[in-house]
From Swiss-Prot:
Traits of the deletion mutant: Does not affect the itaconic acid nor 2-hydroxyparaconate production.
Protein name: Glyoxalase domain-containing protein RDO1
Name of the gene encoding the protein in the UniProt record: RDO1
Functional pathway: Secondary metabolite biosynthesis
VOC domain boundaries: 53-172
Species of origin: Mycosarcoma maydis
Family matches, as PROSITE patterns: VOC
Annotated active site: E168 (proton donor/acceptor)
One of the Pfam families matching this protein, by short name: Glyoxalase
InterPro entries assigned: Glyas_Bleomycin-R_OHBP_Dase, Glyas_Fos-R_dOase_dom, GlyoxalaseI/FosfomycinResist, VOC
Function: Glyoxalase domain-containing protein; part of the gene cluster that mediates the biosynthesis of itaconic acid and 2-hydroxyparaconate. Cis-aconitate is secreted by the mitochondrial tricarboxylate transporter MTT1. In the cytosol cis-aconitate is converted into trans-aconitate via isomerization by the aconitate-delta-isomerase ADI1. Decarboxylation of trans-aconitate by the trans-aconitate decarboxylase TAD1 then leads then to the production of itaconic acid.
Family note: Belongs to the glyoxalase I family.
Length: 176
């Protein structure tokens, strides 16, 4: 038995369905008048968004020059774009740099240097990476340790950038 609110809803739905047929209204794909009184604009087709890849991310730093120096010692390239903006490039990815207090809009709700934990896959062996880091005065804070990457086992070492972001350098080849 229908409650009065359900009965009103069915009547409204039936009236809407009749109006749609009489006026030949075209509904968006997947929408239909409902016998339960849910108007088409209230119906949501359950569709998944399909994210393809990561284009860029943003690191907020205290000192742009120190940050650029650190990441170029890891093999990244610095690029300028827009009006005085700087980014780090590697592979087909980019890290945009924002200086604390001079962030570009829109920005993170609380842009904070030192809050990142990033993992970079390297072409080199972990042993070669450790040697490179030592030659460039970058201290390994942990590792090598076995971890699980996005596509399987990895071997990783950890360092900290000038803002104390945790940077993981990983090799899939060394994990085999």
């Amino acid at each position: 038995m229908l409650r009065s609110s359900q009965a009103r809803s069915v009547v409204r739905s039936s009236q809407w369905a009749t109006t749609a047929r009489v006026h030949q209204l075209e509904l968006p794909s997947g929408w239909k008048p409902s016998a339960l009184g849910v108007a088409p604009w209230q119906q949501r087709q359950q569709r998944q968004l399909s994210v393809r890849s990561l284009d860029h991310l943003v690191i907020t730093c205290h000192d742009m020059d120190k940050t650029i120096d650190f990441y170029t010692r890891l093999g990244m390239s610095v690029v300028q774009f827009g009006q005085g903006r700087k980014a780090l490039e590697f592979g087909s990815q980019k890290i945009n740099l924002h200086q604390k207090g001079k962030e570009f809009e829109p920005k993170a709700l609380v842009p904070q240097p030192g809050s990142q934990d990033l993992c970079f896959v390297i072409h080199d062996s972990i042993a070669d990476a450790q040697k490179h880091l030592q030659e460039h005065g970058i201290q390994v804070v942990e590792g090598p340790v076995k971890r699980t990457g996005a596509v399987g086992p990895i071997l990783s070492i950890y360092v900290r950038d000038p803002d104390n972001n945790l940077i993981e350098l990983s090799s899939y080849q060394d994990a085999k």
